[in-house]
């Protein structure tokens, strides 16, 4: 609990010790294939300290994996088009984030990102009235919001010719 930018703040545990063990294995594999870890990445039971991975190449297994824990991968992009290419080079597409001071760029980039949800200039902006869901291997369909309600409705078409 607490401000995530303060070292005294504590993150809650992962869903299980097994989940934390899997995260440790993923990080070890990423480092073995050339990634660099910033942060401690230490495990204590189901607790896991935050990690930032850099130097992840497309050949690194981490590039195509989901990390269910406090892990962020940081990539360097040469320009906006390259950043979009990096963002879309994944089999997953649940949520993405765009941070910019240019509102036109924010919408232009968000429109090109292949994800079910794109949040601009903020994290944790989801809400029960907004649809939630992904594309690619991150699922299909939506839950929550009007679109989510429609996922649980059976519609029937009846056509009568006279």
Predicted segments, located by residue:
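Conserved C-terminal structural/oligomerization subdomain of aldehyde/semialdehyde dehydrogenase
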Residues: 44-162
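Diglycine-centered glycine-rich loop/turn motifs
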Residues: 36-41
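Flexible, acidic loop-helix segments that line cofactor/substrate-binding pockets
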Residues: 1-25, 42-48, 64-69, 128-131
